[in-house]
Amino acid sequence: MYLQKKNYCLLCIILLFGAGCSPSGSPTDTPTTGHIKISVDETFSSIIDSELRVFHGLYKYATITPSYVPELQAIQDLLNDSARLAIVTRELNEQEKQYFESLKLYPKSLKIAKDAIALITHPENRDSVITMQQLEQLFSGKLNSWKQLNHRSELDELIVIFDNQNSSTARYIREKFNTELPPYTYAVNTNSEVIGYVASHKNALGVIGVNWISDKDDSASIDFLKMIQVMRIISDSTDTRGKQPYQAYIANGSYPLTRDIYIINREARSGLGTGFVSFVASDKGQRIILKSGLVPATMPVRIVGFQ
């Protein structure tokens, strides 16, 4: 009797302390339960907030805490094991892959959407069209005034505003035009700050992720769109009017400034990170991306304009 009582007490102690912790290295989460942290390119904060809101509604025992940071930091968080997932606009490079291989880890990358870079200006700026050739000159330092774009312009000095010097947007422009950014480009902190700056400075040209102004059901997106105008880009001599970053133009590649969005998962097993990746890639998760104004990886789209 005494032995049975002693064993019962020991079992209670194990359950009491084992419920809140686990042996070192043992999993504490499943695809639909537990708590993990992820790092997300700040450009996509509104989309991932929507994905997480629905995911958490479906799985009440799951908690995913996002950190919205510049892309470079998101990759670094993944390397440092301070984030289970990274949501970014590039795949791992060879050096990063080799680092993970040295740890016997083989992160999986999944394309979840196609994104676009939007160029925005002050609503009173009459220059609403720009060519790819002019953009190349602009970002290489050969063109630094609105009058060089259009001699009839009422504006002179031109300044370019990015969200962050370490952002995916700045990296995209550097790689797209194979150049370092000229001295008349400046960085604030976030995409929303870019919009705010452009809305209050007539001579500014902002470079943002299109999802900040493309969700017709999001009040913040609607308010942002009222503050600025979206430029049309002429890609070649066959394009006479230029195109804005509508979903269909992003999907068929006729809008020239597009990029893919990836989820990179460093889990070596099927944990909560894997569960969230599966959700985002599912029909429900892809519909959230479609609604945001981006192009989902697996669904057809239609043209919806900016108004």
For the regions a protein language model found, what residue spans apply to each?
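Conserved catalytic core of two-component sensor histidine kinases, primarily the HATPase_c ATP-binding
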Residues: 116
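Bacterial N-terminal signal peptides that target proteins for export
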Residues: 1-9
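Exported/periplasmic ABC-transporter solute-binding proteins
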Residues: 21-60, 67, 71-72, 76, ...
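Periplasmic N-terminal soluble interaction domains immediately after the signal peptide in Gram-negative
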Residues: 104-108
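Pocket-flanking alpha-helical
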Residues: 72-103
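Bacterial N-terminal signal peptides
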Residues: 9-19
